[in-house]
Structure formats: structure tokens, C-alpha cells
Amino acid sequence: MTVLHSIDFFSSSSAPVAIEARAPQSAFPEHHHDFYEIVIVEEGAGVHVFNGNPYTLSRGCVCFVRDHDRHLFESTDDLFLTNVLFRAPDAFRFLSGVGHFLPRECDGVYPSHWRVNGQVLQQIKCLIACLEHAPKSDRVEDIALHESVFMQLLVKLWQGCQTQAGDDQEGRLYQLLDWLQNNYSEAVEWPELADRFALPLRTLHRQLKNKTGMTPQRYLTRLRLLQARHQLCYSDNSVTDIAYLCGFGDSNHFSTLFKREFSQSPRDLRSQL
């Protein structure tokens, strides 16, 4: 597995933060690094496989990667990212309490993926632009100013995550996307789901396609296929059981869709492991 080292990304040993833009981000194999990373999705779509678990990416996704996490990007489609790198939450000279504004693992569950709305993405652009420039010098005041901008960015993201589930259409669409990520195996009737999240059905179709580049049904099918691939790799369940566990009513249809998506059948994938 590829290991990325901080010496290759930070401008100096004293620089607390580095910015790496990916415009666009192409597919990138599984890797980890000796620093922390905040991945901010500005445009496009793709799949982020984080510690073996697949997450679909779209505009407004924010991913928090620790120094012991492994991840990769695949199926990217005009995926524009900004990566904010920092050495560790406790590695700043003048900041404390950074961890309060980062995801916290609880009972073995790490909420690595957040969502923020377009307004927050716009607000943080100027902060990212400031962070792109290394501190003017190694003087304590320049380091302190640089670190203070990073803290502003963290607070903006944290506040944006807390408020993204607001009662406007964009907030309700984000709630729906999160619901699908966690309930992909359930039978979905789109008119009922639209009512549940107080979205007109046509608006749901239009906005979801605008956010993800896919129709709602295509998005759901892809979620299910990604989860099925994960189970094929990391569980002992049979192909038939996995098909049903991931929301497919027929294992033959599942195999057909899987081969169309990944250019190999579920059994072929299993045989390679």
C-alpha cells in the first residue's frame, strides 16, 4: 500500500497546514499517510472507499481522514477536491481543543463523512486561499496567524455540518442522501420517500441528479452494488445472501447489474480474493 509522507507536502518542518487541490481528482489507489487530511468536495462525483467501506461523493461532502486510516478514490467523474492537510490535532503550537471540531469515534464508529451546503463551500473559499500560502516566516506571530485561519475553517465546517439538515430543500435533500447511505437495503418507493422528506417528487429527481449526476434509482442501485462488493470482499456470506442483504430481490438480476458495473461477476471477484 502506498504511504504518503508529510515531508513531501508541507512547505517546511514548521508549516502547520498544507493545501493540495485536485482539479480534477482521478482514481487513486488505496493509501494512507503520516498526517491528517480534510477532503472537501467542490464539484463532481466519485466513490471514496474509506477503511474498506464505500461512500458516494458529491458536492458538499467533507471527509476527515486520520493518520491511521486507509482510503482510495474510484469511479471519479469531474471530481474537484480541496485537501487540507495538517500534522495532527495536537501538533499545533498555538491551538488547543482542535479535536472538539473534528469527528469523534464512539463505540467503534467514526463519523468520517459530513455534508455542508453550497453557502458554506463559498464561505470557506477565502480561508482556503489564505491557507494556500505558507506562513510568511518562522516567527511566532506568522505561525499563530496561519493556525488561526485553520481554526476558522474547522469551525465553519463544524457549524455547516450542524446546520446542513436545515428546513430548506437543500437541507432536506442532504437528509435524504444520508438516509439512503444508511438504509440502502430497504425497499424504496420514491413518491413515499419524497413525502417523508417534504420534497416534491420532481424536485427530488432534479436535485438528486444535479448533486450526484445520477437519477435517484441509478444512485440507489449504485449504493447497493458498492455495498455488495464490500461484502463480497470482507464477509463469508454467499452471493445470493449478499444480493438480498443489499436490497436486490433477485440474485440473477443482481449478478447481471454487478457485472455491468464492475466488468466482472460477483463469483469472479470472490475467486480472485
From Swiss-Prot:
It is found in: Cytoplasm. The record marks D241, D250 as: Interaction with sigma-70. PROSITE patterns: HTH_ARAC_FAMILY_1 (PS00041), HTH_ARAC_FAMILY_2 (PS01124). One of its GO terms (molecular function) is sequence-specific DNA binding. GO terms for cellular component: cytoplasm. Residues 191-212, 239-262 bind DNA. Keywords: Activator, Cytoplasm, DNA-binding, Repeat, Rhamnose metabolism, Transcription, Transcription regulation. Activates expression of the rhaBAD and rhaT operons. This is HTH-type transcriptional activator RhaS. It comes from Yersinia pseudotuberculosis serotype I (strain IP32953).
